[in-house]
Swiss-Prot record:
Its main location: membrane. Keywords: Cell membrane, Membrane, Transmembrane, Transmembrane helix. This is UPF0756 membrane protein CKR_1028. GO terms for cellular component: plasma membrane. It comes from Clostridium kluyveri (strain NBRC 12016).
């Protein structure tokens, strides 16, 4: 019951904050709980959901290449420009942060911070025009900050 109340609070905040992806995901989980399918589907989602979500996200990003809107020449030009090189470096850093974040949340077991990450994403979507895809990077920044803090404090 407590988890349902928390999900309803997240749903309310995400609807008010216009974070539609968070609202949809929360509704999906609430429906699974209502149908008592959570016992079967939650373990699968917890194990494979991130991977499946990334596959869909990356596929949607690759569509301009797949449908021919991006050519080999334009790709070559991007990688020889300062913007392309900068994008590559930022991508390396954010992908590294995402890995740190996933490790921090899952392997190190700090999933209790997820409500704060979601709320931050919802607030950013509502008031800053953000898109709530950053909890993994945010948790990566937290993990990196803690690593640096521990090194400095040692």
């Amino acid at each position: 019951m407590e988890s349902t109340i928390i999900l309803i609070i997240i749903l309310t905040a995400s609807v008010l904050g216009r974070a539609n992806s968070v609202a949809l995901a929360t509704c999906f989980l609430l429906i699974l709980k209502l149908l008592n399918a959570d016992k079967f589907i939650f373990p699968y989602l917890q194990e494979n959901g991130l991977f499946l979500g990334l596959v869909i996200l990356i596929a949607s990003i690759l569509i301009p290449i797949a449908d021919g809107k991006v050519s080999y020449i334009s790709i070559r030009n991007v990688f020889t420009s300062w913007l392309g090189i900068f994008a590559l470096l930022v991508s390396l850093f954010t992908t590294y942060l995402s890995g740190l974040g996933m490790n921090y949340l899952t392997i190190q077991g700090h999933s209790e911070i997820m409500p704060a990450l979601i709320l931050g994403a919802v607030i950013a979507a509502a008031f800053l025009g953000g898109v709530p895809v950053g909890p993994m990077i945010t948790s990566g920044l937290i993990a990196l900050g803690l690593k640096l803090f521990n090194k400095i404090g040692s």
